[in-house]
Amino acid sequence: MLFRSLEPNKDIGLFYGHLSTAPGNFLEDMIVYRYDKVAEEPPADQPEIGEPEGVGLKRVIINLAKWGSVFQELKWFTEKTLEPKFESCTVARTSAMAQGEACLVTRNNPMHDSVPYLFNDLSDETDILHEYFIPRAAYNPFIAQAREILRNQSLPVLNASVRIVHKEDVALTYAPEPAYSLVLYINQPTDADGNARMRALTRALIDVTLKHGGRFFLPYQLHYTGKELLASYPELPAFLASKRQYDPTELFSSTFYRAIKALSGVVP
């Protein structure tokens, strides 16, 4: 796989894949973004990060993509063909060979620019972020099954990305071994029916993740069951026991903490 072959390259500063959400090649074709290191420090005249360009147009396109296959295909066409031609540069356009990919940027630029246009301020709907961490050897069978789940449900998938994840040695790790992460951005109505559909979809994706030895990211939505929670994070009871040991009065608490404690079945 391309990701596996490029990961050891220390000259790459940022690398990820953006999957198609168009029906014709849904979660099959991918745009790969690669940023090579040219210096450890930015040049002295590097501009400060400002407001990203084209946010309004990008948001219009992503909103249109909720309305069916024609607009989803249009979104993929603009991402694959048009956006690279209009990316802003911090060096002269002639020096950048008239290609957005050839621009000199800091690592913060691509990470910053992707956020504002994803913000949904429309009433009666919202966009929900999902992330699933899959052992690398299991990624191909996982994505095949995830693709079928997502195709056979009614909520619009607005964005899908794949990123490399290294082993994380923390108490509640989402990556006990090297993994690939599937990041999804899914639109839903905010009424009871929309919440029910999102809950069912989330649980289906969690179940296929667990089937392939993966884990889901805890904080996004509390749509998982206690069984799914403990299957994904078997360390949770020990974590909660340590929490009680060092904080017996539960001075440090939150709605999220109380929710996962209740789901885990741990006695208060």
Q: Where do the model's predicted regions map?
A:
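Noncatalytic alpha-helical scaffold of FAD-dependent oxidoreductases
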Residues: 1-268
